[in-house]
Amino acid sequence: MSVPPRAVQLNEANAFLKEHPEVLYVDLLIADMNGVVRGKRIERTSLHKVYEKGINLPASLFALDINGSTVESTGLGLDIGDADRICYPIPDTLCNEPWQKRPTAQLLMTMHELEGQPFFADPREVLANVVRKFDEMGLTICAAFELEFYLIDQENVNGRPQPPRSPVSGKRPHSTQVYLIDDLDEYVDCLQDILEGAKEQGIPADAIVKESAPAQFEVNLHHVADPIKACDYAVLLKRLIKNIAYDHEMDTTFMAKPYPGQAGNGLHVHISILDKEGKNIFASEDPEQNAALRHAIGGVLETLPAQMAFLCPNVNSYRRFGAQFYVPNSPCWGLDNRTVAIRVPTGSADAVRIEHRVAGADANPYLLMASVLAGVHHGLTNKIEPGAPVEGNSYEQNEQSLPNNLRDALRELDDSEVMAKYIDPKYIDIFVACKESELEEFEHSISDLEYNWYLHTV
């Protein structure tokens, strides 16, 4: 992932500023370990300098916990003097922010060492290292995300979220009503602005569907033949959705499980692989007989326990699991089966792909993709067989065997020899240190339920 030539960069900046003389500011964006977008806001007059020389940001940006505090045990904070690295623009990510009252653009960045090589702890680079292994095989990954979220009221009830009132009916939704078109109409202005904003920003969002809970929706991204770009789109789509919803006097949550007893938010990813001739190596009239497909699935299933910390990176992530919510809890696969971890849609022989259905919407897309592709590559190179596909309800046929809490998931990741071949062990150490720090803080907190149960009872 080399830095593009200076002339190419400046041409992009010049063309954009010429086309958009109204733009006053530019937000320089970079996604941290948690997928939280951070960065700087500059005046338009400084944009050329950013393209020419980059901007400095501390390496500790990739050692932040979910609250934005540096986790010193990572070694990226005070141990190195909280030193800067340099961030360069990612080509073709300069665009307008349609929600801003003062005309503002945005530009996605990636971090490098001062000498120019990519910084190992940038999640985008973590993914790039895995993608290079497919490049060496002459293979191209096609990928697309499905992103679930809740619209919520800007006013909480006793610190808990609640569905927003419909701008159309004035009522709060209370039923599931999956795929109900009328529920799309209840929030039509907000949802249409999301799709139109995505189009303006070049994000290939092609559909919104009503999901399985009150005011829960899913945006589908179209597949692209670049898994890093697919993750860029997912990160930027989350930011777009949050800001468009706020413009409509609502909030949004991508929390994995915001409501007890309701469906959680997932982040499913669809993956196919093209050979040098651009043909899908998974294409088959009979997917069970396609060796490449079987081996890819076999590798993903074998590494799934080690993927879990990246797929479900927060304490709340594990509250999402349950048969009634279509969240798989064992490493299994099936043909057109939504109860399994790896579903193979069977609509078209040319479009055969794997759908990875485990991750929550709170996952960092780059790390999610890196861990899944690590499994795919592991399976292809070692010809790992996945076993027979599950028919019917997998929850009745397979006991839960995936890690069901963050601590166990971190242990699986830390102990995985396979994952360490694909993701720099130094990065795994940093990730585990950050998540263990969050976990320790969580475990030392006292919940409202504990006070309700024990304060006056024991």
Regions found by a protein language model. Name each.
Residues E148-Q162, K210-H222, M255-E277:
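Histidine-centered divalent-metal-coordination microenvironment in nucleic-acid enzymes
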Residues D182-C190, A207-A213, D226-L237, I241, ...:
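Short, contiguous, pocket-lining structural segments
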Residues L107-E113, F217-V224, I271, H356:
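Short, hydrophobic beta-strand segments
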Residues M1-K210, K229-Y233, N398-V458:
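ATP/Mg2+-dependent ligation/transfer catalytic cores
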Residues S2-V3, V8-N11, L240-N243, M250-D251, ...:
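Catalytic-core signal marking the mid-to-C-terminal active-site face
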